């Protein structure tokens, strides 16, 4: 039976090798070689000149992740306290926008935020605006939050459904205020969901290029835009693009490692 179970893992192993390990080695190879295939570190030196773009990408990704967490935490708690049949209905509403094409959702925000769009029309009723909200960092963050907040809600909801409500009630019976219950009970016990949600939001946010191009215009280039330009744009250069991808991968892994270590420390404190 154990041998049979191991055989079931073979297709997954082959899939991981072909579509994860092999592409990773290809990226590393191109990042550390020039057009002739000779070893060089010039590509990494070139990437160092785009430090401001990396910093902007990290900043906007962190902001969008924090905003998603602030929105998703109360939503996840609210969903976890509903009856099971209502939970299913509300989860369907949360997931419904994810069924729509990513580009269409972003295009919709272009229309909403345009000078003649509904948002400026509502502001005009109050004698405000019109404001040029497109091609700004705020529009990029808004697009990230809208597209990725479901990925924060779902893991938080899953973690919170596992919290024994009697523990929360016991804390309140012992005189803990709502704020103290939140920070001493709910948040520590939701750390697994918070950690997963941060990873699921931060990784696509820091590497996005569609949202930054459509809502940020050319004035808010992110690292994803530069990588896309190196592989598909006029600046075609596989070696530099691979070096950028490699550096971004290292940054993401470091951030995930930090989140994972924080997760473990918090869980030890709870236990």
PLM region descriptions:
Residues 2-12, 22, 26-27, 157-168, ...:
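C-terminal transmembrane helix and the adjacent membrane-cytosol boundary/short C-terminal tail
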Residues 21-29, 70-75, 103-107, 116, ...:
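Membrane-embedded alpha-helices of multi-pass transport/permease systems
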Residues 41-49, 53, 209, 213-267:
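Interhelical loop and adjacent transmembrane-helix boundary motif
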Residues 6, 14-51, 112-116, 218, ...:
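Short membrane-interfacial helix/loop motifs at transmembrane-helix boundaries
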Residues 41, 106-145, 179, 215-219:
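Membrane-interfacial helix termini and adjacent extracytoplasmic/periplasmic loops
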Residues 8-9, 75-112, 168-169, 182, ...:
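Cytoplasmic-entry segments and transmembrane alpha-helices of multi-pass inner-membrane transporters
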Residues 49-81, 178:
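Transmembrane alpha-helix signature in integral membrane proteins
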Residues 11-20, 66, 96, 146, ...:
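Transmembrane alpha-helices
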